[in-house]
Amino acid sequence: MRSHYCGDVNKSHVGQEVTLVGWVNRSRDLGGVVFLDLRDREGLIQVVYDPDLPEVFNVASTLRAEFCVQVKGLVRARPDSQVNGQMKTGEIEVLGQALTIINAADPLPLSMDNYQNNSEEQRLKYRYLDLRRPEMAQRLIFRAKVTSSVRRFLDSNGFLDIETPILTKATPEGARDYLVPSRTYKGQFFALPQSPQLFKQLLMMSGFDRYYQIVKCFRDEDLRADRQPEFTQIDIETSFMSSEQVMAKTEEMMRGLFLEMLNVDLGEFPRMTYNEAMRRFGSDKPDLRNPLELVDIADLLKEVEFAVFSGPANDEEGRVAALRIPGGAALSRKQIDDYTKFVGIYGAKGLAWMKINDLSLGLEGIQSPVLKFLNDSIVNEIVSRTGAQTGDIILFGADQATVVAESMGALRLKAGEDFSLLQGEWRPLWVVDFPMFEKINGNFHAVHHPFTAPRGVTAAELEANPANRVSDAYDMVLNGCELGGGSVRIHNQEMQSAVFRILGITDEEAKEKFGFLLEALRYGTPPHAGLAFGLDRIIMLMTGASSIRDVMAFPKTTTAACPLTNAPGFANPQQLAELGIAVVEKAVKTED
């Protein structure tokens, strides 16, 4: 039905007859000549119809937005005065000689020109129209090219694309599972995988030493701008490779991807330990474009008569950190109050501050409500450590170390945006040496997952002192976003059982949930390591989209619903009976 895509026609085709198909982007009747902008996935082209062919001209005059049409015509160069540098095809146009309406379009339920006027609900309900917009189409085309590039790289490096099951067993991986009832085994349920983690480890045990899969994963969790109930991972696992080798290979892949797709050389990725990242930036995924850093000052404040500072300074689990903002002395009291409310979202009880109005005046040039609690040497040392200059402000966080890291880390990011401090376009890094466990409400939890190997200890040593052990794990971070994370896996039964015990998983529970894994670890399991990238997040960053919903063809809303298909929906009584399921209606309270 066509000879060319609309966006592919150029000056080399001048004088040629072409057949095009697509949708009417816009139609204009200007003084007896109809100008038609025809659109397909590759772009727009201008088609001109004049009254010399009255039958065709009359049909062209009836066209409206989103009619699906076929156009036949002659490519000609535009006059210099009419060249449109904003269009890929702006140097040429097509003189229409034939026109067929393939399918008419009713008046549209959403705006195609001013899509900002459409609600998120409208865009998702009529997604097939929203995806016709060039911006959306280009993102999906870009996504397809990214996955093609990733496959080529992994294929050429000996990785095998192997599918793993979608219907599997529920395992504790941090989020709630989506459950699928079994008709055959009434009362029992499959779970949709949160990741192919255990199956890819079993593939390593099966001898497939380089595996990958671009795979759908499912998590029933509260949604944010960068979360969806179903998402796509670039999943990778290797045998007989160290963490250094896995990082080197996947870094090579990511650098090649950015060079091919964006012509961006990311350079070598620096390394940073988890502890350093938390100390300097208050985050395990720091945005290195932001030059602001947290500075520890607890050692200066142990003896001050200001409990807000001295309390955390003398607490082993406390922290006092300072954040210098260049030019921040210009902040009004209201703006400082807004920052105080902001850190309160993250659990901070307040936000002390110190304005450096004129450093040449010494303490006379410094303004702060806490100045009366600090002697000259402490103030001078704070100014020195933070590198504060005239016109700066120093903000203070004092609380439990976790609260200080989270609140001041978030404030660092906000201030970096507010003061336009970001430097450079792309700043990747590896974050390594994560803690093996974290304690929540007195119980140990795996920082990554329970199959991550500790670094350099035996099972007995791990159980003797789990709190201070480091995992052989690594996260790739770009511009403050975690692109992917991975680790060396546990490859012997003794260590895996020890980790389960530390996590409070009894032997009986471990056998019930992970018996197949513990059994497999008895039969010559090779050392193995891997990593998984969030494909949706990578595409979002590379295209500059504001949400992963804008780089997925048919995403869900923030309430995990699909307005297009009205999913989820109710099952009919026959389906429920076949599954042996009874729906319990939510109890309604009635007043006595």
UniProtKB/Swiss-Prot annotation:
Q: SUPFAM superfamilies under this entry?
A: Class II aaRS and biotin synthetases, GAD domain-like, Nucleic acid-binding proteins
Specify which residues bind ATP according to the UniProt entry for this protein.
Answer: R219, D220, E221, Q228, E482, G534, L535, D536, R537
Q: Where does L-aspartate bind?
A: E173, R219, H448, R489
Gene3D superfamilies recorded? Bira Bifunctional Protein, Domain 2 (3.30.930.10), GAD-like domain (3.30.1360.30), Nucleic acid-binding proteins (2.40.50.140)
GO terms for biological process? aspartyl-tRNA aminoacylation
- What catalytic activity is recorded? tRNA(Asp) + L-aspartate + ATP = L-aspartyl-tRNA(Asp) + AMP + diphosphate
Note the InterPro entries from the entry. Aa-tRNA-synt_II, aa-tRNA-synth_II, aa-tRNA-synth_II/BPL/LPL, Asp-tRNA-ligase_1, Asp-tRNA-ligase_1_N, Asp/Asn-tRNA-synth_IIb, AspRS_core, GAD-like_sf
Write the record's keywords in alphabetical order, separated by commas: Aminoacyl-tRNA synthetase, ATP-binding, Cytoplasm, Ligase, Nucleotide-binding, Protein biosynthesis
One GO molecular-function entry: ATP binding
Highest taxon of the source? Bacteria
User: Where's it found, cell-wise?
Assistant: Cytoplasm
Q: What are the boundaries of the region Aspartate?
A: 197-200
Q: Cite a GO CC annotation.
A: cytoplasm
What is the purpose of this protein?
Catalyzes the attachment of L-aspartate to tRNA(Asp) in a two-step reaction: L-aspartate is first activated by ATP to form Asp-AMP and then transferred to the acceptor end of tRNA(Asp).
Task: Provide the assembly information.
Answer: Homodimer.
- Record-stated family: Belongs to the class-II aminoacyl-tRNA synthetase family. Type 1 subfamily.
Q: What is this protein called?
A: Aspartate--tRNA ligase
Species of the source: Shewanella baltica (strain OS155 / ATCC BAA-1091)
Its encoding gene is what?
aspS
